[in-house]
């Protein structure tokens, strides 16, 4: 689950992580009142959407008066902001963060991520702050410093200091930088984060080390024990199809293609998308119905896929282990009848009760194309759309 920047800073502040003073505003009038409450003559007006790249897209403004704060707030609120992370449709700005301006001397990058290779949290840092870390990794990977953290003892002070020295934090501020990293790590672990990115971390003219931006993502599987984080959820920033899918325990992620996919198992779902791409198609979604899908669940999955106007065909790829092929077949037939499906539909079944499943499909009288293998199914759906 993602949250807004201002919410992330609220979380970090509780862990002693230094962040600029700021307030959220939903109207231009609130923006002015927020600015008035800050002890600063320079203000930063920041669009709050669940996407990066806001600065380059014009979503961050520097205001030197209350009149400018109001003008920028009126300009941004209600505007659709398009960044490299939003896609071409962009996201509508519904709230702003009004912050005090900072005297920035140098920008850095600090991030905590889960490293699947080591099954540990890794602290990453770079003196190339303010730019995309992916860009730094591609062009100057030697500028990214890492520390692998032992989960038994957590991030140690010496590791934080080593990282601070490695990215050339001024010597007199290494202690503050280390304290910052230790607070960030504590927040990461206690709040079940999957990503914590501070870009940029800044050193200010008055000798402070603070997070100028904060991106926190949380493990959705752990939210049951993070009630306070759940309160930060902003459904307006989420895909309505993904919200609907979650009601039925379906794992759905919308993509940009035109071939809808319904698969059981995350690994098979990713392989299905790969093979569609291999044969020249473009998947419209990732959809994992899981191992305990019922006919009702399959029907809802179909409805969610078809709510995407870009979908021109559907590929159902099921390997029945726990899942029974006849249950899937019944769900496919029921869903096809309920929604009045007119798009090409290719179904590949394999595993438990596969013969019964194929029989149900063939005797349904519906226009369903059967596939003998995953490759066969991918080629057929690509040729039909």
Swiss-Prot record:
Q: Which GO terms describe its biological process?
A: succinyl-CoA metabolic process; tricarboxylic acid cycle
- InterPro entries annotated for this entry? ATP-grasp, ATP-grasp_succ-CoA_synth-type, ATP_grasp_subdomain_1, Succ-CoA_synthase_bsu_CS, SUCC_ACL_C, Succ_CoA_ligase-like_bsu, Succinyl-CoA_synth-like
Q: What class of enzyme is it?
A: ligase
- Among the entry's GO cellular component annotations, what is one? succinate-CoA ligase complex
Q: Which cofactor does it need?
A: Mg(2+)
Q: Which residues bind ATP?
A: 46, 53-55, 99, 102, 107
Catalytic activity field: succinate + ATP + CoA = succinyl-CoA + ADP + phosphate; GTP + succinate + CoA = succinyl-CoA + GDP + phosphate
Q: Which domain of life is it from?
A: Bacteria
Domain ATP-grasp, residue spans: 9-244
Which residues are recorded as modified (Phosphoserine)? Answer: 220
Q: Paste the cofactor note.
A: Binds 1 Mg(2+) ion per subunit.
Q: In which pathway does it act?
A: Carbohydrate metabolism; tricarboxylic acid cycle; succinate from succinyl-CoA (ligase route): step 1/1
Which Enzyme Commission numbers does its entry carry?
A: 6.2.1.5
Give the binding site residues for substrate. 264, 321-323
Q: Which Pfam families match?
A: ATP-grasp_2 (PF08442), Ligase_CoA (PF00549)
Per UniProt, the keywords (alphabetical) are:
ATP-binding, Ligase, Magnesium, Metal-binding, Nucleotide-binding, Phosphoprotein, Tricarboxylic acid cycle
Keyword Phosphoprotein on this protein? yes
Function per UniProt: Succinyl-CoA synthetase functions in the citric acid cycle (TCA), coupling the hydrolysis of succinyl-CoA to the synthesis of either ATP or GTP and thus represents the only step of substrate-level phosphorylation in the TCA. The beta subunit provides nucleotide specificity of the enzyme and binds the substrate succinate, while the binding sites for coenzyme A and phosphate are found in the alpha subunit.
Q: How does it assemble?
A: Heterotetramer of two alpha and two beta subunits. Interacts with BrxC.
Entry's NCBIfam families? PRK00696.1, sucCoAbeta
Q: Which family does it belong to?
A: Belongs to the succinate/malate CoA ligase beta subunit family.
Q: What is this protein called?
A: Succinate--CoA ligase [ADP-forming] subunit beta
The protein's organism comes out as Bacillus subtilis (strain 168)
Which gene is transcribed and translated to give this protein? sucC
